[in-house]
A protein has these predicted regions:
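Conserved catalytic cores of phosphodiester-cleaving nucleases, focusing on short active-site segments
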Residues: 34-36, 41-53
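Mg2+/Mn2+-dependent nuclease catalytic core
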Residues: 51-71, 75
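Structured catalytic cores of enzymes that bind and process phosphorylated ligands/cofactors
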Residues: 13, 101-102
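Beta-rich catalytic cores
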Residues: 30
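Nucleic-acid nuclease catalytic cores
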Residues: 73-100
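Short, conserved beta-strand edge motifs with alternating hydrophobic and charged residues
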Residues: 23, 44-47, 85
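Acidic-basic catalytic patches of nuclease active cores, encompassing PD-(D/E)XK
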Residues: 1-25
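Charged phosphate-binding loop/patch that engages nucleotide di/tri-phosphates or the phosphate backbone
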Residues: 107-145
């Protein structure tokens, strides 16, 4: 599987009520991969697909560019829900705050599946109960190992 296939697998699982825009902007650097919208608001997601290292202490290289970091940070400062989703095989790690030095152990401890990711995207855009969990979390939530 690659990033394109991973994103496609998530999109297939989304509720039909979610508006999906797969962003492909060759002229503006740093723009995330997707925007999701619904009556409760919008959500930006930058996807990174990796081969998960075997050693638990290995730091994961996401390949996030400085422009992508800047874009995500700016949107989060303006209180727009923006996630970094790191996918590996059939699992993913959802980060609502940028985090440096993510280890394989951290990934494995905090991973979820793509069904849950699709449900959370739906919840945020449609205004369901899980919306506050990932859009208003304190920064420490994703910064501790």
């Amino acid at each position: 599987m690659n990033e394109h296939s991973f994103v496609k697998s998530v999109h297939r699982k989304l509720d039909k009520s979610v508006y999906v825009w797969k962003i492909a902007d060759r002229y503006s650097g740093g723009v995330p991969d997707a925007m999701y919208a619904g009556p409760a608001g919008i959500l930006f997601v930058e996807y990174k697909y990796i081969k998960l290292p075997k050693r638990p202490t290995t730091i994961i290289k996401t390949g996030l560019s400085p422009l992508q970091e800047q874009w995500i940070t700016q949107m989060q400062q303006w209180k727009h829900p923006t996630w970094l989703v790191i996918g590996a095989e059939k699992s993913c790690l959802i980060l609502n705050k940028l985090k440096k030095n993510i280890s394989t152990a951290y990934y494995l401890k905090n991973q979820t599946d793509t069904n849950t990711l699709a449900r959370l995207i739906t919840d945020v855009t449609q205004g369901q109960p899980n919306e506050k969990i990932l859009t208003r979390a304190k920064p420490e939530k994703n910064l501790e190992r």
